[in-house]
Amino acid sequence: MVRSFPSDGWSALPTRFGFWPENPTTAGVVSSRVFSARLPEVCRQVHDKQPFGMFKGENGMNYTFSTFLIEAILIIFFIKIVYVLLRPLRQPRIVCEIIGGMMIGPSMLGRNRNFNYYLFPPIANYICANIGLMGFFYFFFLTAAKTDVAEIFKAPRKHKYIAAVSVLVPIACVGSTGAALKHKMDIRLQKPSSIGGVTFALGFTSFPVIYTVLRDMNLLNSEIGKFAMSVTLLGDMVGVYVLVLFEAMAQADGGGGAYSVIWFLISAAIMAACLLLVVKRSFEWIVAKTPEGGLVNQNYIVNILMGVLVSCFLTDMFGMAIAVGPIWLGLVVPHGPPLGSTLAIRSETFVNEFLMPFSFALVGQKTNVNLISKETWPKQISPLIYMSIVGFVTKFVSSTGAALFFKVPTRDSLTLGLMMNLRGQIDILLYLHWIDKQMVGLPGYSVMVLYAIVVTGVTAPLISFLYDPTRPYRSSKRRTIQHTPQNTETGLVLAVTDHDTFSGLITFLDFAYPTKTSPFSVFAIQLVELEGRAQPLFIAHDKKREEEYEEEEEPAERMGSRRVDQVQSAFKLYQEKRSECVTMHAYTAHASKHNMYQNICELALTKKTAFILLPYQKERLQDAALTELRDSGMLSVNADVLAHTPCSVCIYYEKGRLKNAMVRSSMDPQHTTNSSHMRQEMYRFVVLFLGGADNREALHLADRMTENPFINLTVIRFLAHNHEGEDEREKKLDDGVVTWFWVKNESNARVSYKEVVVKNGAETLAAIQAMNVNDYDLWITGRREGINPKILEGLSTWSEDHQLGVIGDTVAGSVFASEGSVLVVQQQVRNQMGGDGFLNGKFDYKKLVSPWSHSHN
């Protein structure tokens, strides 16, 4: 169907191909009249051939296809330019896209007749408009396909109450305002269905909008982000059906009477039943037929994407909002792998980067700020503005007030109130739908688009200012290895991505020598990239609920969980073998790579661990240049953890003799705490002590290893010539720790200590290279804090990876030619402000429980 929207004060417009006449009869022109006699006619000139080229004297811009290509280039270009310009102002992508679309419309460049004449003639605009509508449909389908509807039933009661208050109060207030202003409204806006539609749009906050904005702001995995998505998802499930009721009212207002309303509701019910009973089961059959770990067959994906168009056709034919079909279809798609993730992988980039720009071009073409005038203000614009202001204020006050009532921290409550007012894609399409149903005119539509831009453009930076998801992770309390009392339990977070990384980190833990008197409490978290679902998922594996969870798990979720079974089995096996000296707590976090650090830091904060152990997974490709590197994805996670950690951090790069070594106990029978034994051979470890807090932390960790009878430890301390560049305070702290270490291990024949005096970084590097590097199985060093800059002078420019620090990167590099593994330590950076409450936005973890945190296993 060719959609053409009414235009106030429309008159025939001249184009290259003639006019848009009231009754076109010109030969060679095809006319299509849509909707009603008062609407403009869409005229298309027939071309029976393509241009031979500019060198033949022809103008390619006279042909529809050439014009369409230029339009596509300009649309995408303008949107990208606006995004680049506004991104430093912390504007979400949706705001940039709407403004980019407006640039080609009558509000900006479209005011120029030559611009329209050559670049955006009506003959090509109608093609762009239909592609734009398809972009909206597929966007809503993919977003709905990522949504786990089952989370609604698992949401805490508090979330349900807040969702109800944040929806009912604005609806009541906006509806009352609309009723009071009814006598001042335009005849189209006076209809009950029109007032109800506007009230509904201002009362509800759509889940796709919250999801996309929070994704742009990297807040999906934050506590308040999960909270907001839970609340909006609850409201959306009600809102979809309320929208159908308003559509039924519109059927009655359109003159169809009760007969058309009844058939409308019957059609909607039949479609919903078919989706639940037929389509959903077909999707489950596809999931069951897909091999474990594989992608869904391409033929199924094509058929599903074609089904989106079928759902659009049916809902449009029934008279419903055309977006309802894709949303309903997406909701019955099993989220996550394999089907949801395959749909996202195969189509998301094309939809977001190519189709959606046409969607915003459609929005921009219909937005005309020049129609906001004294003539249109009283009846078309002012009622919408008053209702919008009432909706914003009541939405903010009701959401914030309800959150405060349930003891949500003040800063988080204010942030939630702002999030509930965000506007985006589904709101814009709803405004277009109002024009289609003649609920508002173009002036009213333009005002609502500007309202969406202003509200989202202002609230998004305010959210960034009010809510910093990393702020709570900094602790004022000491959480380090150095300050953990001896002969007490040491807590640590173990972050793994697969079985290989787990094996390497466990090997290191055994070298760290947990015993009955000095055990480890390990919080092992497996990181899984979020695929095919919108909501992050954090699972705490509780043995008591293992059977219950497996029975409740959905088929699609079982398919997705098979990939983590191997790691979870390894967690369980290690716990059984080391039960006397290690307590293992297993978790799984499904999140995007940008947000994984939040799961790690939050776990370390709540469990009060002394350090976090991370794998270093950057390896050089075989037979490739030294600059060619493979990044497994953990590098960005490691960098974020180092920047926001609430405790100390250890990064372990396993290679050489320790790589894939079997974990067996090498402990003295008096200290044996399990039945697994490390290889009966001696290992040589070396600590490169350059001074500073990080190196002091590294030395304390190495001290734990001295208890292991199969480890020889060498400590080499580097000192600056004539004490140049030394910080007196750091020097005293270093002397104290080194003295303590030497006194404690003076009688230990497996521990040796050396001092090396150097003048600059070159001598430091030469001293390290002078060592027999292949004699050492593990190099231990601090990352950077407090190191005398004189010792590293000239080395910083050669460092490729700052995660490992200058020395760590040097000994880990291929140029150094060492086969030893590397351990780099960063001591906790304390939060000097300290305290909890409003100023630092401290989370209330016990009260603010995410609906995506489930206990099982």
Swiss-Prot record:
The keyword DNA-binding does not apply. One of its GO terms (molecular function) is antiporter activity. Signal peptide: none annotated. Belongs to the monovalent cation:proton antiporter 2 (CPA2) transporter (TC 2.A.37) family. CHX (TC 2.A.37.4) subfamily. Specifically expressed in pollen. One of its GO terms (biological process) is proton transmembrane transport. It is a multi-pass membrane protein. It comes from Arabidopsis thaliana. The chain crosses the membrane at residues 65-85, 93-110, 122-142, 161-181, 194-214, 227-247, 259-279, 313-333, 385-405, 413-435, 447-467. The modification Phosphoserine is found at residue 855. GO terms for cellular component: membrane. The gene is CHX25. It comes from the Eukaryota. Its main location: membrane. InterPro entries: Cation/H_exchanger_TM, CPA2_transporter, Na+/solute_symporter_sf. It is found in: Membrane. The lineage of its organism: Eukaryota, Viridiplantae, Streptophyta, Embryophyta, Tracheophyta. Keywords: Antiport, Ion transport, Membrane, Phosphoprotein, Potassium, Potassium transport, Transmembrane, Transmembrane helix, Transport. The keyword Cytoplasm does not apply. This is Cation/H(+) antiporter 25. May operate as a cation/H(+) antiporter.
